[in-house]
Amino acid sequence: MPIITLPDGSQRQFDNPVSTMDVALSIGPGLAKATIAGRVNGQRVDACDLIEEDASLEIITTKDEVDGLEIVRHSCAHLLGHALKQLYPNAKMAIGPTIDNGFYYDIDLEESLTQEDLEKIEARMKALAKTKYQVIKKKVSWQEARDAFEARGETYKMEILDENVSRDDRPGLYHHEEYIDMCRGPHVPNMSFCQHFTLLNVAGAYWRGNSDNKMLQRIYGTAFHDKKALKDHLTRLEEAAKRDHRKIGKQLDLFHMQQEAPGMVFWHHNGWSVFRDLEVFIREKLTEYGYQEVKGPLMMDRVLWERSGHWDKYADAMFTTSSENREYAIKPMNCPGHVQIFNQGLKSYRDLPLRMAEFGSCHRNEPSGALHGIMRVRGFTQDDAHIFCTESQIQDEVTNCIKMVYDTYQTFGFDNIAVKLSTRPEQRVGSDEIWDQSEEALKQALESMDIAYEIQEGEGAFYGPKIEFTLFDCLGRAWQCGTVQLDFNLPNRLGATYVGENNERLVPVMIHRAILGSLERFIGILIEEYAGFFPTWLAPEQAVIMNITDKQADYVQEIAQKLQKCGIRAKADLRNEKIGFKIREHTLKRVPFMLVCGDQEMEAGEIAVRTRKGNDLGKFKVDDFVSYIQDQIASRKLNLEE
């Protein structure tokens, strides 16, 4: 006779074990119709799963934009499998999980799928979903599940059972009419919930992400509760495609990638200009916030990486080389090198806090399938810093880091920032006392600045708690960039000490701090955020001066030289082309200011100024325009609408 407690505190008693759907029906048919699944004592369950004991229950409905939507998307992955097996009976199904904003299914199929094939598969999915068939869940023995997949020739499902499922488990098999899939669930009770979906694209993916395994075909899709949400999402995807940093990077001659150097960026003059301006900006912030800039070696002996503990955890991701019977690793991160710098010379508590920053050239052997333009690379530059401080200085130093993070992000126009605080995991180093003190210091630092944050219990690293900063761009996409991570482990492992007030040797607390993260990735984010319309201070070309006829050529050259001498990235366009053609071309290049010179402007010692967005700013005296654009650059104004 289970007693079910609902979110509003009300209780319902039942004579027999009861399912989420039964409870929903007891409340009303409308709720039952909208019921997708349940959350029993905080655990998600299928709507048909029986509750045998007293429990709290939350009914997951179509109004749930988190769990409810994730379940719908997962069920759409099964629906995709159902349609695929009908159209391609020889296809072997691998895995079909949900991802951010959608789902995918990996399949082994001899023929390569095209966009036209996806349209055919989607049409079959819609025809199946239209019938609103019931999804039947059956818990079976391990052997029954394996027999079912062996009879269907599903070798990947058999491998999952053999390697990932205990023989004592009772896997859940979900029956979609004649199609069977295996999953922990939960899933929708019927296909009436899977009506608003689309397939997006197909790509290659190695089985289990291992390049030694067979390359499968991965079909991506997305789904929503209603037609409008799906349409809005597809509109955002179209806009994201227009803003793709790889496409704009080529249009603006910023960078390129090539097969001979996978995951390594070839910066062109225009892109390197943006990169250097970012470095200059961050260097100013480092000075403002009291950092020393250092530079560590690119490569260090394996022995040091073993001492730091990175060899055990990162060896597969490290590029190595050898010389004179010694093995070296190219650094994947800067922190061990910074500890070596700290260790040179005796340090006193009076020397702390010591804030050490580096634009570190790092390399990680990322899987080739994970590489993505300059967003995910193998060679990158970290705007990395490490702060060595006493335990009593933690809160002040973390507060200083947070101020720097927000100060930096606001310059680029990022105001929507989500903050997460990750606390101690079960396996950790350091005393409970230092963890208590550190977690409280991080909380106090955030709360002193009125910053809302979400606590992620147990998600901290084994060596200390951390704060993560996630930016949301103009399309609502999340980019995790900044981190403030405490470390009680590395200084101790690498022998970092300072002399305390009582002449004792103490181990400093180390704070890892990143703001942009990887400069390459952050530039990719900026390209997509601005759609290539960089603020004037970042724009590779800040102004172009154009003549209407040959008569103004010398005047245009004179202005270009004056702007260049004033530190403005300007050039003269003296081509024998119509002025409208020149304006269109430089508009496509996203040059912030286009200066037009005809006879009238030349005689008056003026220039006609228009922006890349087509705004006519009128006529300026040359010196007045120099002051105007210098103010834009010096103040780092966004001026994205100009």
From Swiss-Prot:
Record-linked Pfam families: HGTP_anticodon (PF03129), TGS (PF02824), tRNA-synt_2b (PF00587), tRNA_SAD (PF07973)
Catalytic activity entry: tRNA(Thr) + L-threonine + ATP = L-threonyl-tRNA(Thr) + AMP + diphosphate + H(+)
Cell compartments where the protein resides: Cytoplasm
Matching InterPro entries: aa-tRNA-synt_IIb, aa-tRNA-synth_II, aa-tRNA-synth_II/BPL/LPL, Anticodon-bd, Anticodon-bd_dom_sf, Beta-grasp_dom_sf, TGS, TGS-like
Domain TGS: 1-61
GO term, biological process aspect, one: threonyl-tRNA aminoacylation
Co-factor(s): Zn(2+)
Gene Ontology CC terms, in alphabetical order: cytosol
SMART domains hit by this protein: tRNA_SAD (SM00863)
Domain of life: Bacteria
PROSITE patterns membership: AA_TRNA_LIGASE_II (PS50862), TGS (PS51880)
UniProt cofactor note: Binds 1 zinc ion per subunit.
Family per similarity comment: Belongs to the class-II aminoacyl-tRNA synthetase family.
Name of this chain's protein: Threonine--tRNA ligase
Originating species: Vibrio vulnificus (strain CMCP6)
Gene from which the chain derives: thrS
